[in-house]
Design a protein with these regions (language model features):
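Hydrophobic h-region of N-terminal signal peptides that target proteins for export
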Residues: 10-18
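Generic cytosolic/nucleocytoplasmic N-terminal low-complexity/intrinsically disordered segments
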Residues: 1-2, 46
């Protein structure tokens, strides 16, 4: 079964079975050839935490291949994580990829406990790169979808560095949209529009 067909199926399931923003497309784990996870610790997502993946990544780069490398690295002997660390990943073209199970506690290389955090990462290094318009738009739509689907308040939207003194993640060029409340305001607007339908 090819990747395009799987993505179409996943999109249809999202349309029929979910109540979040309707234009959202999430590529399933099979799209990037995910390995099966190891046994994991469960949690209930209660807040949204934004990351950047931390490596320079451009629109022309192969996102599925890179995501697979991130999973392989994370599950390797140096980290020994149960899966890719994030619940969702967004590439610079605005494509969204399913990461680990949302009800699995995510991973971090810093000191904060990610239990209860739904981890969304934007692919790139936003200390050095700007966030693309497509990536920012996809991030806002995905957060609104997750807030709606998992009953998470937009007031919980924060970043990795808000919980850890050991990192600048998600980078100054993404963090500025949290500092000025742009992301939170846009998410709240999407949720308000949905509530009026």
């Amino acid at each position: 079964m090819n990747k395009s067909f799987l993505s179409i199926i996943f999109f249809i399931l999202l349309q029929l079975g979910c109540s979040g923003p309707r234009e959202l497309i999430i590529h399933p784990r099979s799209y990037w050839d995910a390995s099966d996870p190891k046994p994991f610790k469960r949690h209930i997502p209660e807040r949204i935490t934004i990351h950047h993946e931390g490596t320079i990544f451009n629109k022309s780069d192969d996102a599925p291949k890179h995501i697979k490398k991130v999973q392989t690295w994370g599950m390797g002997k140096d980290r020994n994580w149960v899966d890719i660390p994030y619940h969702f990943l967004i590439d610079p073209n605005g494509n969204i990829y399913e990461g680990r199970n949302v009800f699995t506690v995510g991973e971090t290389a810093t000191e904060y406990d990610p239990t209860g955090h739904l981890l969304i990462t934007c692919m790139g290094n936003f200390e050095e790169q700007e966030v693309s318009d497509e990536q920012l738009e996809a991030l806002i739509k995905l957060i609104a979808y997750c807030c709606d689907k998992y009953n998470i308040s937009p007031s919980t939207i924060a970043s990795h560095k808000d919980y850890s003194k050991q990192t600048v993640c998600p980078g100054k060029n993404l963090y500025k949209y949290l500092e000025n409340n742009f992301i939170k305001s846009e998410v709240e607007d999407l949720l308000l529009k949905k509530s009026r339908l």
